[in-house]
Design a protein with these regions (language model features):
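General nucleic-acid-binding
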Residues: 1-28
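Short alpha-helical segments that sit at the start of domains
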Residues: 28-55
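Short, cationic-aromatic polyanion-contact patches
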Residues: 44-53, 68, 101-115
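Hydrophobic residues on short alpha-helical segments
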Residues: 57-59
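A short acidic, leucine-rich amphipathic alpha-helix
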Residues: 69-76
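Basic amphipathic alpha-helical segments that dock to polyanions
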Residues: 72, 83, 87-93
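A short, conserved structural fragment
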Residues: 91-101
């Protein structure tokens, strides 16, 4: 099954509230909810989380889940401490799943930037 995460940058609270209310109504009606949205207040906030290295980690994990941070660091040839920081940041916004080791559950990340 194809899974998509949606990143939103610069949306006002009203947009976030409308999206949450619509999801609440659908869930209350019994519809299964499989959406993942992350909202950033600014481009700078997004850029602070989604770096080039973290994007590379997501791509790697999408195709090669890892049993641990140490195993991931070895697989990509990077320092454990830096990989740990990257995994923490990406897991915090739900782009890395830690349920059974480390994996990237989404095959697509879509971004909407408000100007």
């Amino acid at each position: 099954m194809s899974r998509k995460a949606k990143l939103h940058v610069g949306e006002g609270f009203d947009k976030v509230a409308k999206r949450a209310a619509a999801a609440w109504k659908r869930a209350a009606a019994g519809e299964a909810m499989h959406e993942h949205h992350v909202t950033f207040v600014s481009w700078e906030a997004l850029a602070g989380v989604m770096t080039k290295r973290r994007y590379e980690l997501l791509r790697h994990l999408r195709h090669h889940p890892a049993p641990s941070v140490a195993a991931l660091a070895r697989a990509v040839g990077r320092d454990y401490k830096r990989i740990h920081e990257d995994v923490e940041a990406l897991a915090e916004i739900g782009l890395i799943d830690r349920a059974h080791g480390l994996s990237a559950p989404f095959d697509t990340i879509e971004a909407t930037l408000r100007l």
